[in-house]
């Protein structure tokens, strides 16, 4: 029989008393009452907060949205095949956050910040809450720097500034995404961090966008956030906020950022689906009453920060899809009222061969004018008015047989201006090229060039400047102004290119 040693027992007891941990861990646990359609009703989560992350038994995460007397309504961020009635749910005490930082550049992530591009984990320790308060009035300053899109018709007539929210709106297949991608490509070498958020899109479309960005060397400074059409509604709803959080990290470091939300119509539809399944009362077009707040709190996060805050900026280009050009529907009118202007793309113009198919008459930039460079502002002042008048005259002239000479001349110039503004996809132009092209049209220097040869003339003019007048391009890009000496040089170049071209026609 083993002898009991009192000193050994007492030392063990003393050790256990010393190591005794008095802290009590309390976890708030509930039970799933009902589950289906990406929604779970949970009993027992008494201490949960609105918007809090929940963890289900199988590891699936959810967000508590409806806090009712006897149950909690939560949306699931995943398929949750292992969750069933009676499963346990634990509240985490946290709000959804995503990894941020330099390591995110060049990566494709889901709305939870998890990589989906097959390149392994993202080596970053920085995190940021998906939902953040927008900067207040004192932290902002007015928009004053240009955000060059590389698309002549936008930079000349509907200029966008850093920190602006400019809506791109139009029917399906009118080139909305093309404008956004061109803008990202044009930021190469500008030290701008871009975030492209794809909401409810086909996986093939997103893969195509990523491939184009990679080919053009734009993926190095771009983060792609994708919530595909097959993803849960909760993830499609969260995706834009994730994109904003990733861009905010760079904005508060004093950098310029550009975020594209493609598109917010799908996000609103995902939010409507969630709200109806949570039995929230429907409003106009069955959208919930707070769908305006859903978009306004997102787009208000775009700002140009004051110098005290580092001077960073977040420019937002939200995209909205209309049905048969109806901009008076609920979501389009909401987003138009939140943003600082809109670029309206017309299906009729697109089908007639005008690319980008921008309807100049109803497109507007409410704050971008202050940010426009002096060079383009000087020559493009009358361009928008001339094109808008041309559209009206062209419609009127179909019914009139004899037009006076001034009207005839205005129509002829309008045709040439429209041809000049045609631009191929994925080929953004720099400021000097835009100035040269617009100057030629506005000053009437190409009135003798046949309409069908105007596009060819514009290409030859740009080529001539690159080969023979590199110093002209350099000075415009550096000074961003068009002085008398440069105007004289440009006029001579245009006349020379025109005469050599007309000689061969």
From Swiss-Prot:
It catalyses: ATP + H2O + 4 H(+)(in) = ADP + phosphate + 5 H(+)(out). Keywords: ATP synthesis, ATP-binding, CF(1), Hydrogen ion transport, Ion transport, Membrane, Nucleotide-binding, Thylakoid, Translocase, Transport. One of its GO terms (molecular function) is proton-transporting ATP synthase activity, rotational mechanism. The record marks 363 as: Required for activity. The keyword Membrane applies. Its main location: membrane. It is an enzyme of class 7 (translocase). GO terms for cellular component: plasma membrane-derived thylakoid membrane; proton-transporting ATP synthase complex. It holds the Pfam family ATP-synt_ab. Its EC number is 7.1.2.2. ATP binds at residues 170-177. It is found in: Cellular thylakoid membrane. It is a peripheral membrane protein. Produces ATP from ADP in the presence of a proton gradient across the membrane. The alpha chain is a regulatory subunit. PANTHER family: ATP SYNTHASE SUBUNIT ALPHA, MITOCHONDRIAL. Belongs to the ATPase alpha/beta chains family. F-type ATPases have 2 components, CF(1) - the catalytic core - and CF(0) - the membrane proton channel. CF(1) has five subunits: alpha(3), beta(3), gamma(1), delta(1), epsilon(1). CF(0) has four main subunits: a(1), b(1), b'(1) and c(9-12). This is ATP synthase subunit alpha. It comes from Prochlorococcus marinus (strain MIT 9515).
